[in-house]
Each structure stands twice: as C-alpha cells, then as structure tokens.
Amino acid sequence: MCKKLNGVFAFAIWNDKKQELFLARDHFGIKPLYYTRLNDELVFASEVKAILKHPNCKAVINKEGIEELFGIGPSHTPGISPFKGIKELEPANFIIYSKDKFIKKEYWALKTKNHTDSLEKTCENIRFLLEDSINRQLISDVPLRLFIIWRFRFKYYCNICE
C-alpha cells in the first residue's frame, strides 16, 4: 500500500476487525514518527515529548543519541533518538502491531541505475516530474502563496503554478 503513496506522511490506522495497528512513514522520512514498546502497549507520536508524557515512559538518556545530537546536529542515524527505548521509525518503513505481533519492515528502497537518456530526454523528464510534483502540491482548500528563495527559479515555478 505505502509504495503507491506519493508525498510526505506518517500515519497510523487501526484495524478493529484484526485488532491490529498499522504505522507507516514516507519514503524519505520527511514526517517524523517515534515509537516505544511499554509492556503490552505500543506508544507512538510525531514528537518524542508526546511519548514522554505517557505515565509509564521514563526519560532515560540514550548516550548514542545524545552524541549524535551534539556531534552532527539535527541530522542523525535513522532509527536513533536521544532517549533509551524510544525509536524513530526509519524512512520507507511500516509497523504492524497487535497484542501478539510486532512486524517492522521496509517497503521501499531507492534504486540506482545507469543513466542512458539524452540531455533532451533528461530535461523533458525533469520538467514532467517537477510540474507533476508542483501541481500535486497546489491542491488546497485555502488560498495558496508561493515563497521561493532562489530568484532564478522563481519565474519558472510561477509559470507552472499558473
């Protein structure tokens, strides 16, 4: 299911019939999703501080996570958090959780291949992908605004948005 989703997401779906929870994170990990297992419970949230509010969750420092936080700043190894027992669901992964089951699996991986297209074909493909991406982001129920930092790209983006 997640392979077919296009965009940024982190979500949970409860299947009442199977008594299962399905958690998933987008392909590149843009949206965060943290979790911890506390006895029979799976506690999850988009921020660690929300998990720490759970009465059974203790804020115990994870040395590896703290070293990364101070060593490389906001960048970090996928899956690592500054607190013991609290993990970040890696990009392009999902979890299926029930009382007697915990499955964590990668649903997608970036693949590389040799580039054989001509410059013209490459430019055509990039234009299509860029326009498709922008057009999907323009779907909104509120007025849209465009904020572009790079001046030389501004006119191009505005033309696509029209």
Set out the residue ranges of the language-model regions.
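Cysteine-centered catalytic environments shared across enzyme families
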Residues: 1-162
